[in-house]
């Protein structure tokens, strides 16, 4: 008997992204940090993880392309991103605060979605198969 991994597979991503679209729209419309946190608090854990994954991919890509300065908060971001996949329901509004306060949220999300689309169509490595 094979046990299903608790982590999303590549095949899961189209549905997860589709389910996250309303939250993504609300996040992009949110004018304040507090509203962004409120939007995420209204979401299911799957949606939060999908949104965060998109942000992480976008942020990491921009960092690698050196479009953003290297500074101390980047180390915090890397630690935060590493823990996303084990995010628990009660922690939803905690560590997410770092990213939701960023002013370039739109750029992170658009870059992350672009990477996932490429990954899903070309068999890349961004969408996790298993852990």
Predicted regions and their residues:
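Helix-rich interaction surfaces within compact, conserved domain-sized segments
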Residues: 79-131
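Amphipathic alpha-helical segments within well-ordered protein domains
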Residues: 36-40, 53, 97
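Short, hydrophobic/amphipathic alpha-helical patches that form generic packing surfaces
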Residues: 49-59
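Short coil/turn segments at secondary-structure boundaries
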Residues: 53-54, 66, 124-125
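Beta-sandwich interaction modules
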Residues: 38, 60-63, 100, 117
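Structural motif
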Residues: 38-48
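Mid-chain, well-packed structural core segment of small domains
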Residues: 62-90
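General marker for long, soluble alpha-helical cores
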Residues: 3-10, 17-24, 29-33, 37, ...
């Amino acid at each position: 008997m094979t046990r299903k991994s608790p982590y999303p597979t590549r095949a899961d991503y189209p549905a997860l992204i589709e389910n996250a679209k309303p939250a993504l729209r609300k996040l992009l419309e949110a004018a304040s940090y507090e509203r962004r946190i409120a939007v995420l608090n209204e979401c299911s854990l799957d949606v939060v993880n999908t949104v965060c994954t998109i942000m992480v991919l976008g942020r990491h890509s921009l960092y690698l392309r050196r479009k953003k300065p290297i500074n101390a908060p980047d180390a915090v971001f890397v630690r935060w991103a590493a823990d996303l996949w084990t995010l628990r329901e009660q922690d939803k509004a905690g560590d997410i605060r770092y990213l939701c306060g960023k002013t370039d949220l739109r750029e992170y999300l658009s870059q992350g979605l672009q990477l996932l689309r490429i990954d899903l169509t070309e068999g890349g490595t961004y969408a996790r198969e298993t852990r």
